[in-house]
A protein has these predicted regions:
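Alpha-helical transmembrane segments of integral membrane proteins
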Residues: 7-227
């Protein structure tokens, strides 16, 4: 056994793999969270602003997406198509955008009744300008909190798919290291250093962003401070 965390059965340094996995974990988590939350915030604001039958239609579409289980779809898509990290991120974005919609819509319904929104409409401001100039900026703090809470989910989903052998084999992720450890019989051979470090890395990264998200949520929602 050599190196800080030892080597696997192919003499690859585990520490180097764990460090390389940080880059991909951050990319997968942050990119998925950024794209999905941005879509969800804009969708929720538009739904709240337009109202009427358009709002009802948008909410029915939202309910269809939120009722579809993401992980089975990801497993099927990864099995049908060649495993690719960008396809995986794209599919996660398709399902993750529904997360903030309900909360954003309820906040948007309150914002659109504000006096300055009515004044902007009376002065002839377009709906697009009102939505993106006056409403969306007020939801940016909530969007950041939502992003922080979405990052752990994206990292865990990628690790799950990689552990099942459906991840991108061309990149080094923590899930891919665990999959290699499983195939290499690490647990049967007692090679705990091949399994524990990437597992702890996933847990640590997930907890870090989760705590950041909870802290931001408490700041944005004073009612949570009393709990």
């Amino acid at each position: 056994v050599h190196g800080i965390l030892g080597t696997d059965n192919s003499k690859r340094d585990i520490w180097s793999g764990v460090i390389a996995g940080v880059k991909w974990a951050m990319l997968i988590g942050l990119l998925t969270a950024l794209v999905s939350v941005s879509i969800g915030v804009v969708y929720g604001v538009i739904s709240a602003y337009v109202g009427g039958w358009k709002d009802s239609l948008m909410q029915r579409i939202f309910e269809i997406f939120i009722s579809v289980p993401m992980l089975p779809v990801l497993i099927v898509m990864s099995a049908v198509f060649k495993p690719n990290i960008w396809v995986m991120i794209g599919i996660m974005c398709i399902f993750y955008w529904v997360g903030p919609v309900k909360t954003v819509r309820s906040m948007g319904l309150q914002i659109k009744e504000e006096t300055y929104i009515e004044a902007s409409r009376a002065l002839g401001a377009s709906n697009t300008r009102i939505i993106f100039k006056h409403m969306v900026p007020l939801l940016i703090p909530y969007a950041f909190a939502s992003m922080a809470l979405n990052v752990p989910g994206a990292i865990v989903v990628e690790a799950t798919l990689s552990l099942l052998g459906l991840g991108d084999p061309n990149i080094v992720t923590w899930g891919q290291i665990l999959q290699d450890a499983h195939n290499g019989g690490a647990m049967l051979s007692g090679m705990w250093w091949w399994v524990v470090p990437p597992g702890l890395a996933i847990a640590f990264m997930g907890m870090t962003f989760a705590f950041v998200g909870f802290a931001m949520d408490k700041i944005l929602n004073p009612k949570l401070k009393t709990r």
